[in-house]
Swiss-Prot record:
GO CC terms in record: nucleolus; nucleus
UniProt keyword Oxidoreductase present: no
Protein name: Uncharacterized protein PB1E7.01c
Positions of the UniProt region annotated as Disordered: 30-163
Modified residues (Phosphothreonine): T127
Pfam family, one: DUF3245
Positions where Phosphoserine occurs in the chain: S125
Species lineage: Eukaryota, Fungi, Dikarya, Ascomycota, Taphrinomycotina
Source superkingdom: Eukaryota
Species name: Schizosaccharomyces pombe (strain 972 / ATCC 24843)
Compartment(s) where it occurs, according to its Swiss-Prot or TrEMBL record: Nucleus, Nucleolus
Amino acid composition bias (Basic and acidic residues), ranges on this chain: 88-118
Length: 163
């Protein structure tokens, strides 16, 4: 007994019922509040496909991640042979220089780190001395504060002794 209704028929029924209710409401409100209906405005955003997400089951990228490397290689292949050899030699020299400098840089970094570590140790010892000095000052202040009392305190002490 249940009838199968197609989506188009159902959509048309829905739109007609909405338009009837809007017309009825507009008739109650009068001509002042008439505005362009939402059907004419077409407020609904167009449906777009969702971009693929990362994670389990995600599709791979179409472009390779090293596309800039491949483009450089393609440019290098398209050059004349003499220029190609010259550029390759320059790249090899650059790599060799980086290897040599890499060892030097490593030693330089070790030296710099050792210097920084020594400076930090010196600063730490200086702050420890300052902490000791400040503790000594605080204890001497508290002793002086106890020794110095107002005149009223003296009368309090005398009053306690008389009783």
């Amino acid at each position: 007994m249940e009838q199968k209704v197609s989506a188009d028929v159902l959509l048309n029924k829905y739109q007609t019922s909405i338009s009837i209710t809007k017309n009825l409401i507009n008739s109650w409100l009068g001509n002042e509040n008439t505005s362009v209906s939402s059907d004419e405005k077409n407020d609904d955003p167009p449906l777009q496909a969702r971009p693929p997400r990362l994670g389990l089951g995600a599709s791979r990228k179409d472009q390779s991640e090293n596309s800039w490397v491949t483009s450089k290689n393609e440019k290098l292949k398209s050059l004349p042979p003499a220029l190609k050899k010259k550029i390759e030699r320059q790249l090899q020299k650059k790599k060799e220089a980086e290897k040599i400098e890499g060892g030097k840089n490593h030693d330089n970094l070790k030296r710099k780190l050792n210097k920084v570590g020594d400076e930090l140790n010196e600063q730490q010892s200086d702050t420890d001395d300052d902490d000791d000095d400040s503790k000594a000052r605080i204890t001497s202040r508290s002793k002086r504060a106890n020794a110095q009392s107002s005149g009223f305190d003296i009368y309090k002490k005398l009053g306690k002794k008389k009783r």
